[in-house]
């Protein structure tokens, strides 16, 4: 930048800070979806782990099921118009997976997208960078994440394999975004302890299923030997 060649140390530090912003150099390790069930309860589904492809496949199942029940449903995210939606779509392509219909904008004109972004809504038709999720939570009186983790610390948490912690961090952000959207519509918001958290995918679940299946397989094997 400005004709100055960065040192190896500076490049290393910038890589740690900026690589996660690019779908080409990073991966998804956690996703959360917050939604109201038919009884009006707030449910938050968490998908987390090291296997990105499995996370995206599980996410597709949920998104496609939601669309099957309501073809007009929309996704809502914060600063998602220029990051979360395109980033997630790119990771689907990189993993050679079909993009869920609700994220696929390939056949849409720029003004035809149905998904919403609270950052764009907060601009109220104006221009500018908008506001951070935390700033909006503060000014609107919305509960802020209770996980002692911020965005630029997720990478370190990933390498420590703290996937459940990252998943809950994402869930609290999803709930906060949900509450902000309800504030825009003058509706009541939810406290974090009023939310039903569901682990929709984690590698611990897969490992548990394998462990639980082993005794049954052993019994079948032994029974076969006896006969």
Q: Model-found features: residue ranges?
A:
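Conserved RNase H-like, two-metal-ion catalytic cores of nucleic-acid enzymes
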Residues: 1-65
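Metal-dependent phosphoesterase core characteristic of DEDDh/y 3'-5' exonuclease domains
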Residues: 26-41, 67-168, 172-194, 201-211
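Acidic catalytic cores of enzymes that act on phosphate-bearing nucleotides/polynucleotides
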Residues: 197-198, 203-227
């Amino acid at each position: 930048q400005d004709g100055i060649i960065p040192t190896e140390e500076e490049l290393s530090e910038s890589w740690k800070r900026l690589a996660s912003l690019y779908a080409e150099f990073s991966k998804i390790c956690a996703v959360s979806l917050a939604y109201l069930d038919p009884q009006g309860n707030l449910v938050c589904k968490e998908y987390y782990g090291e296997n990105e492809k499995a996370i995206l496949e599980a996410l597709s199942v949920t998104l496609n099921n939601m669309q099957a029940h309501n073809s007009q449903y929309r996704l809502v995210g914060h600063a998602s118009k220029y990051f979360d939606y395109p980033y997630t779509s790119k990771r689907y392509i990189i993993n050679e997976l079909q993009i869920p219909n609700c994220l696929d904008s390939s056949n849409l004109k720029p003004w035809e997208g149905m998904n919403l972004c609270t950052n764009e809504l907060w601009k109220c038709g104006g221009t500018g960078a908008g506001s951070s999720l935390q700033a909006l939570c503060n000014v609107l009186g919305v509960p802020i994440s209770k996980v002692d983790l911020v965005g630029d610390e997720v990478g370190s948490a990933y390498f420590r394999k703290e996937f459940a912690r990252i998943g809950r961090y994402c869930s609290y952000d999803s709930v906060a975004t949900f509450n902000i959207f309800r504030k825009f519509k003058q509706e009541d918001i939810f406290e974090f302890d009023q939310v039903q958290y569901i682990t929709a995918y984690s590698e611990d679940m897969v490992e548990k299923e394998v462990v639980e299946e082993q005794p049954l397989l052993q019994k079948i094997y032994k029974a076969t030997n006896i006969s």
